[in-house]
Curated annotation (Swiss-Prot):
The gene is pax8. Residues 104-152 are annotated as: RED subdomain. Pfam families: PAX, Pax2_C. Its main location: nucleus. The keyword Cytoplasm does not apply. One of its GO terms (biological process) is pronephric nephron tubule development. This is Paired box protein Pax-8. The keyword Ribosomal protein does not apply. It comes from Xenopus laevis (African clawed frog). Induction: By retinoic acid in combination with activin.
Length: 465
């Protein structure tokens, strides 16, 4: 087959084969029946009419295809379209369609939409068919009507400003809202600027005579806080806009920069005596000096019970007395660490000439005992052990007398100073007890008589288990 051109035959309406013009291989060719075709071009009108005539004569589609040398798919498509629409013209399916959005149709769609803005596209399509504007072949589809409304009809509503101004009468004017400027009268500040929050919300502000003035103390505190926080004030001033006045912003900054929480501790409301207020820095200084006086001593705090260690309570601040008050929230399980908590302590000034009263470390001295001392410079609060804590036995000490434990608890009807013993527990040997001086082996939980040192742990002691 030559590459330049080919000789083909076209089927005429008589069914004979005649010479055809030269076709390019890239645009046309011969089908499987030997008939010529051109890519992208519809079948000639005479061939279409011949297919329909043969179909009316009762010829089968396969015979029509073989006789006219047209593919069976083309014959079926032409006949199906003819039975459906009654037309044999090409381009109805998959081809170029005639323009249905004519100016007359677009104008009618605009009239329908202006008369009833809520009308749907399918209602407009039915209205076009009812009024006879279009027929079944030229009526636009629903999607086409929506596109016409979106692109062409709505442009009539969104006219430019010049056309709107021209349509007005000579005595009427239309001013855009963007050109409105706030009034420059002296009363503009009291009525609120147009661009301010009060102006936008329509809130009328009171006049300058009716405003409440800040007192001198508030203004002075605001000046001090603004001077101390200059960098913050500068950054806030940079964020200001020219629409706001300086006086309302200064008043707002004054309230925000003021300290909201007091820096003093007051006594509890259920206190019976008058208590003075002491600021937080003074309390912190006294606590820091107390810590430094404790750490400055060269004596180490030992754990042996035979030695007495002194704890310096106050070294310089002799004008204060620590008074413990019993409250409802305090319990018998309070520890000496609660002395450092400002919740349970009240500081009370006393005269330098009188001696300080004795104080109890806990609200229930009958259970834990008490120790007293006069608070003075150079004196130490001396105690054998810290109240409320069981005596600690070093790891090297094997026995401990129960009389020391009895001394921790006041003698009474509920407590006995004798050693605790029970027949059920006395039958066990030393190998069944914990030999180490841990929490379970502490005499605080297991109080017995004079306990000797535990025997060395051997493997034979556990053979019975």
């Amino acid at each position: 087959m030559p590459n330049s051109s080919i000789r083909s035959e076209l089927t005429t309406e008589r069914g004979f084969s005649g010479p055809a013009s030269n076709f390019n291989i890239g645009h046309g060719g011969l089908n499987q029946l030997g008939g010529a075709f051109v890519n992208g071009r519809p079948l000639p009108e005479v061939v279409r009419q011949r297919i329909v005539d043969l179909a009316h004569q009762g010829v089968r589609p396969c015979d029509i295809s073989r006789q006219l040398r047209v593919s069976h798919g083309c014959v079926s498509k032409i006949l199906g379209r003819y039975y459906e629409t009654g037309s044999i013209r090409p381009g109805v399916i998959g081809g170029s369609k005639p323009k249905v959005a004519t100016p007359k149709v677009v104008e009618k769609i605009g009239d329908y939409k202006r008369q009833n803005p809520t009308m749907f596209a399918w209602e407009i399509r039915d209205r076009l068919l009812t009024d006879g504007v279009c027929d079944n072949d030229t009526v636009p589809s629903v999607s086409s009507i929506n596109r016409i409304i979106r692109t062409k009809v709505q442009q009539l509503f969104n006219l430019p400003m010049e056309s709107c101004v021209k349509s007005l009468s000579p005595g009427q004017t239309l001013i855009p809202s963007s050109t409105v400027t706030p009034p420059e009268s002296p009363h503009s500040d009291s009525l609120g600027s147009t661009y301010s929050i009060s102006g936008l919300l329509g809130i009328t502000q009171p006049s300058a005579d009716g405003k409440r003035k800040l007192d001198d103390s508030d203004q002075e505190s605001c000046r001090l806080s603004i001077d101390s926080q200059g960098s913050v004030g500068i950054s806030r001033k940079q964020l200001r806009t020219e629409a706001y006045g300086h006086h309302p912003l200064d008043a707002l900054e004054c309230h925000f920069q003021r300290q909201h929480f007091p820096e003093s501790y007051s006594s509890s409301t259920h206190s019976k005596t008058e208590q003075a207020l002491y600021t937080l820095p003074l309390l912190n200084i006294s606590l820091d000096d107390g810590k430094s006086s404790l750490t400055s001593t060269n004596t180490t705090i030992g754990r042996n019970l035979s030695t007495h260690q002194g704890y310096s309570a106050l070294s310089e601040f002799t004008a204060f007395s620590i008074k413990q008050e019993a409250s409802d929230s305090s319990s018998a399980s309070s520890t000496p660490s609660s002395l450092c908590s400002p919740t349970f302590l009240d500081l009370q000034p006393i005269n330098s000439g009188c001696s300080a009263p004795s104080f109890s470390a806990f609200s229930h001295p009958s259970v834990y005992g008490q120790f007293t001392s006069h608070v003075a410079s150079g004196r130490d609060v001396v105690g054998a052990t810290l109240p409320g804590y069981p005596p600690h036995i070093p790891s090297g000490q094997g026995n401990y007398a129960s009389s020391a434990i009895a001394g921790m608890v006041a003698a009474g009807g509920d407590y006995s100073a004798n050693a605790y013993s029970h027949g059920a527990y006395a039958a066990y040997g030393d190998s069944w007890r914990f030999p180490s001086s841990s929490l379970l082996g502490s005499p605080y939980y297991y109080s017995s008589g004079t306990r000797t040192a535990p025997p060395p742990t051997t493997a034979g002691a556990y053979d019975l288990m």
